[in-house]
Regions:
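Leucine-rich tandem repeat or coiled-coil scaffolds
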Residues: 1-411
Length: 411
């Protein structure tokens, strides 16, 4: 820590690992370290993750933040900060006017801590990014934050994954989204949100005109929730990224989203990984891709689209001129599906990233791919791991790479 003290007027970014902070012999010594750092006149980013800062350390940081006018980013994840520590930091946010990013993920302050931070957000006018992942804030914490969002006019990114907010919390946040004009990114992964919560969010998306990114990974929104979100996408004109990975939407949900893609003209990234989508859902999405001209990234990793679904996707790729990234890994595509996709690559001129891992396309699929790569001049990344490709297939790919100069990454 001596070097930090000596150079404290030169350092702009500082990351203190657990060993450096915890080696201090007492709480007082640790507090002195923090105070010394915060007295720095150039430091803009401070990372103290996994240092067992606790409530006492958070209180020391809070006092320093009240007078510090330089620091813009503070990262305190995994620090055993409880509700008292969150309360202390909230008091600092009432006064501090320079901090723009605060990461408090994986602490333990619960709903009381979230409520304290929410009160601060009603006053604070500089914070733009707040990460509260995995803090057990529950629906009460989400409700408090939603009230703050109705007043706050600077926060643009809110991360609340792993907080068990449930449908009630999702409904509360949805109400805030109807009036918020600044929030652009909302991450609600792994929150026990069901179709009712998804429906509430969908209603908000019909009105909201600022949100560009919504992530609902590992929530049980299922078919009904997907249908509601799909209806919202037909109206919404600002959302560009929607992540519904592992949300149990199935074929029916995929079909509903496909219908939305025929109308929507703003969504660019759609993630449907791990949703038990079979060839029926894949065919629907493929039909949408024939007319959609804005989607650039589609993730369908770990679904069951099979040969028929792959063939439908291949037909879409012959027509579509917008898609840049396509992930069809682990989809039971096999040889025939692989060959169909390779035929499409001969005419497609936009796809640059293609993931076919874990599809058992075999030597015949690899040979078909090598023929496609003699013609295709846009693909730069191709992933083929775990495809039962033997010596003949590997040889064919090896030979074509002597000719093809655009593929730079081949797994």
């Amino acid at each position: 820590m001596e070097s930090v003290e000596k150079n404290k007027h030169l350092i702009r970014h500082l990351k203190i690992q657990r060993s450096a902070y915890e080696k201090q012999s007492s709480t007082t010594a640790q507090d002195n370290v923090v105070l010394s750092i915060m007295a720095n006149s150039t430091l803009t980013t401070l990372t103290l993750s996994s240092n067992e800062v606790g409530d006492n350390g958070a209180q020391v940081l809070s006092e320093a933040l009240k007078t510090n006018s330089i620091l813009t980013t503070l990262i305190l994840k995994r620090n055993k900060i409880g509700s008292y520590g969150a309360q202390a930091l909230s008091e600092a946010l009432n006064i501090n006017s320079t901090l723009t990013t605060l990461n408090l993920s994986s602490n333990s302050f619960g709903s009381y801590g979230a409520q304290a931070l929410s009160e601060a957000l009603k006053i604070n006018s500089t914070l733009t990014t707040l990460n509260l992942r995995y803090n057990a804030i529950g629906d009460n914490g989400a409700q408090a934050l939603s009230e703050a969002l109705k007043t706050n006019s600077t926060l643009t990114t809110l991360m609340l994954s792993g907080n068990s907010i449930g449908d009630n919390g999702a409904r509360a946040l949805s109400k805030a989204l109807k009036t918020s004009s600044t929030l652009v990114t909302l991450i609600l992964n792994n929150n026990s949100i069901g179709d009712n919560g998804a429906q509430a969010l969908a209603e908000a998306l019909k009105i909201n005109s600022t949100l560009t990114t919504l992530k609902l990974v590992r929530n049980s929104i299922e078919n009904n929730g997907a249908q509601m979100l799909a209806e919202a996408l037909k109206i919404n004109s600002t959302l560009t990224t929607l992540n519904l990975e592992k949300t149990l939407i199935g074929d029916n949900g995929a079909q509903a989203l496909a219908e939305a893609l025929k109308i929507n003209s703003t969504l660019t990234i759609l993630n449907l990984d791990g949703n038990s989508i079979e060839n029926k859902g894949a065919r629907a999405l493929a039909e949408a891709l024939k007319t959609n001209s804005t989607l650039t990234t589609l993730h369908l990793h770990v679904n069951w689209i099979g040969e028929n679904g792959a063939q439908a996707m291949a037909e879409a790729l012959k027509i579509n001129s917008a898609l840049i990234t396509l992930d069809l890994s682990n989809n039971r595509i096999e040889c025939n599906g692989g060959q169909a996709l390779c035929e499409a690559l001969k005419t497609n001129s936009t796809l640059t990233f293609f993931n076919l891992e874990g599809n058992s396309i075999g030597d015949n699929g690899a040979q078909a791919l090598s023929e496609a790569l003699k013609i295709n001049s846009t693909l730069t990344t191709l992933r083929l791991y775990n495809n039962s490709i033997g010596e003949n297939g590997a040889q064919a790919l090896s030979e074509v790479l002597k000719i093809n100069l655009t593929v730079t990454i081949l797994n």
